[in-house]
Amino acid sequence: AGNKRPIWIMGAMVNAIKDIXDFVNLGANNIEK
């Protein structure tokens, strides 16, 4: 059950990837830290 929780998080991240692309352009490389 605990392992299923992070799964939905990854799904949200996939959708956020499009926004992340814009964030990277803004210089949000620090997000990796």
Curated annotation (Swiss-Prot):
Alphabetical keyword list: Cytolysis, Dermonecrotic toxin, Disulfide bond, Hemolysis, Lipid degradation, Lipid metabolism, Lyase, Magnesium, Metal-binding, Secreted, Toxin
Cofactor(s) listed: Mg(2+)
Catalytic activity: an N-(acyl)-sphingosylphosphocholine = an N-(acyl)-sphingosyl-1,3-cyclic phosphate + choline; an N-(acyl)-sphingosylphosphoethanolamine = an N-(acyl)-sphingosyl-1,3-cyclic phosphate + ethanolamine; a 1-acyl-sn-glycero-3-phosphocholine = a 1-acyl-sn-glycero-2,3-cyclic phosphate + choline; a 1-acyl-sn-glycero-3-phosphoethanolamine = a 1-acyl-sn-glycero-2,3-cyclic phosphate + ethanolamine
Tissue note: Expressed by the venom gland.
Location relative to the cell: Secreted
Similarity section: Belongs to the arthropod phospholipase D family. Class II subfamily.
Protein name stated in the entry: Dermonecrotic toxin LiSicTox-alphaI-1
Originating organism: Loxosceles intermedia
Taxonomy of the source species: Eukaryota, Metazoa, Ecdysozoa, Arthropoda, Chelicerata
